[in-house]
Regions:
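Bacterial N-terminal signal peptides
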Residues: 5-15
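Outer membrane beta-barrel
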Residues: 91-248, 261-266, 270-280, 343, ...
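Sequence/structural signature of outer-membrane beta-barrel proteins
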Residues: 116-122, 156-158, 187, 243-252, ...
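Detector for outer-membrane/organellar transmembrane beta-barrel domains
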Residues: 278-369, 377
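Outer membrane beta-barrel transmembrane domains
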Residues: 119, 337, 350-352, 356-400, ...
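N-terminal periplasmic/intermembrane-space "pro-region" immediately following the signal or transit peptide
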Residues: 19-121, 414, 424-427
């Protein structure tokens, strides 16, 4: 039947072509007759196309053909000797997930371990000799065609906490992307990174002093992002975020809410461009505002500029690469008797000189937010080895010159390992 239908379709196409390309017949009646024939052929063609679709649907629903050499239905129904009959049992379902359809509803689950060792003295920011710094469990899944969910739990020696947990709506009009839950803010570059993504063992001094340390600006709120059309191959995106108003703790506290109206806000503008086939440049502007621990009438404002340069030659991509990162942050903190204006920055570079080896360095400088006349400086040299994409071993020498003539020399060792399907982090 399929072959017959295809022959009919080809015949109709040939007849239609002949009718169109044939010699013009004089007379209005003959022309009208030809036009009527063309319309009839078109109607028949449409009808045959419908029949072909019906045949295809029936073929898809038909049972699979019996393989050559397989027993026929009559043969399979023939009685067999009792001694040759084996008991056939249904396959046993192991685990509580059931079939593949049920397993598809389970999220991707991963665990990342972060073990750190310290050698050397640091009376300003002391650390234990050995510690399981943080273990992170991630659960990520597509919720429905309109949203996805992400949860990250952190397990440390001080307890368990929700690092991030949010739903992202990705199918909104006008290319808006909305995120609701607890999340790291889009301020700068380092603040949005989890510990295992950092190219160093620690975070820069400016992050610890001005942007809330390891936790950073991480709060419950709403984030709205949109890609802005821009010419000349420039990727431009804008993000606005509204948070409850609590970020950081202790000496690293940035914002603190005293009443429901004491919310904090964050804005970020990002521009990205490929300079050539091997190099790209990523620039960002950031702003954050919230109330500090002194009360509702005292506000802290942060301003930031970040830049990232990436180089990865296509022909030697697995052997050589370079990433340069830098952030500049200004802090305005209202407190008695005077407002404190602090500045901090870091500049770092990481060069891949072998398939699994990376060598990097970082320079740090940061004023203290509550005493801007005190400035801390430092430098680090970092060597990283990646046995595979699921683990990394890193050593870092860190020199810090704290305000008040306190100098420290430390050696930091880190082992990171990953289990399970961990989703990609923002580029």
């Amino acid at each position: 039947m399929k072959l017959f239908a295809l022959i009919c379709v080809c015949t109709l196409f040939a007849g239609f072509a002949c009718a169109q390309s044939g010699t013009a017949v004089p007379g209005g009646q003959d022309t009208a007759a030809l036009e009527q024939k063309v319309r009839d052929l078109e109607d028949r063609l449409i009808a045959l196309e419908g029949q072909v679709r019906v045949l295809k649907a029936q073929a898809g629903q038909a049972p699979a053909a019996t393989p050559a050499g397989a027993p026929t239905e009559a043969a399979s129904q023939a009685p067999a000797p009792a001694e040759n009959v084996a008991a056939v049992s249904a396959p046993v379902s192991l685990g509580g997930a059931g079939g593949s359809a049920a397993k598809a509803l389970n999220p991707d689950i991963s665990m990342i371990g972060d073990f750190i060792g310290y050698a050397g003295g640091n009376s300003i920011q002391p650390s234990p000799a050995l510690q399981m710094h943080e273990s992170e469990i991630g659960m990520q899944a597509i919720i429905d065609p309109y949203a996805r969910g992400d949860f990250f739990l952190s397990f440390g020696e001080t307890g368990v906490g929700l690092e991030e947990g949010y739903i992202t709506f990705t199918a909104l009009p006008e290319s808006f992307v909305v995120r609701v839950g607890k999340m790291r803010s889009a301020f700068g570059k380092v603040n949005a990174m989890h510990n295992h993504v950092l190219p160093w063992v620690d975070r820069p001094l400016v992050t610890n002093s001005l942007v809330g340390g390891e936790d950073g600006i991480d709060d419950a709120g709403v984030s709205v992002e949109r890609i802005i059309p821009f010419p000349k191959g420039i990727f431009l995106s804008a993000t606005g975020q509204l948070f409850r108003g609590d970020s950081g703790s202790g000496d690293e506290l940035v914002f603190q809410s005293h009443q429901k109206s004491d919310v904090s806000t964050v804005a970020h503008l990002r521009g990205y461009k490929d300079l050539n086939e091997s190099t790209n440049l990523d620039l960002g502007l950031s702003y954050a505002r919230g109330h500090n621990e002194l009360g509702t009438n005292f506000v802290t404002s942060l301003y930031g500029v970040d830049a990232t340069l990436r180089w990865k030659p296509l022909r030697r991509a697995i052997y050589h690469s370079f990433v340069g990162r830098s952030e500049f942050i200004w802090s305005q903190r209202q407190q008695a008797p005077f407002e404190q204006r602090a500045f901090g920055m870091y500049a770092s570079g990481e060069y891949q000189f072998h398939r699994r080896w990376f060598l990097g360095g970082r320079y740090d400088l940061s004023d203290r937010p509550r005493q801007a006349n005190l400035t801390d400086k430092g430098g680090s040299v970092i060597l990283t080895y990646w046995p595979s994409e699921f683990s990394q071993i890193r050593g870092q020498y860190r020199f810090t010159d704290y305000a008040g003539d306190h100098r420290t020399n430390e050696l930091l060792m880190q082992v990171i390992f990953s289990l399970g399907a961990h989703g990609a982090h923002p580029f």
